[in-house]
Amino acid sequence: MGSGSSRSGRIPRRRRSPDRRQTGPGETASEGGTADQAPTAAGQEESGRDPRPATPSGGREETLRLLDQLLAESEAWGPQELTPRGPARLAPAVSPEKKVKGNPEDSCASEAPGNSPKRPEGQSAISYDYSEEELMASIEREYCR
């Protein structure tokens, strides 16, 4: 399976502007362009916008500088300023099936070693959504038949 991303790591090609075309040996780049370039320039002036992305000279260096600055600032933020991505989940409700100790369906489900009601200090409780708990119980019932 793929990662789910529709974008690949390819960089889109940029078209060269007519005035930045490479010159051959013995040629010199003309400042005014050629006659076949004139209608294109006139069409751009009439439409009022340039279809090419406006990239100032040294734009790559400026972008890299800004990214470095942002990275340095984000490292200074630290974890105390991070915002949670979603609401905290409540502890799961215990289903009636799990309350019964002598349930034969639970016999095939292995318990994780070291599970105890007491947690060492510094560890946070992992909470699960009730629907996830029910799904796991139904999967256990299905495969323990």
UniProtKB/Swiss-Prot annotation:
Record motif Ciliary targeting motif, residues: 29-33
Disease as annotated in the protein's UniProt record: Defects in Cys1 are a cause of polycystic kidney disease.
Protein name from the UniProt record: Cystin-1
Tissue: Expressed primarily in the kidney and liver. Expressed at lower levels in the lung, brain and heart.
Main location: membrane
Disulfide cysteine pairs (residue numbers): none
Name of the gene this protein is made from: Cys1
Biological process annotations from GO: inner ear development; kidney development; positive regulation of transcription by RNA polymerase II
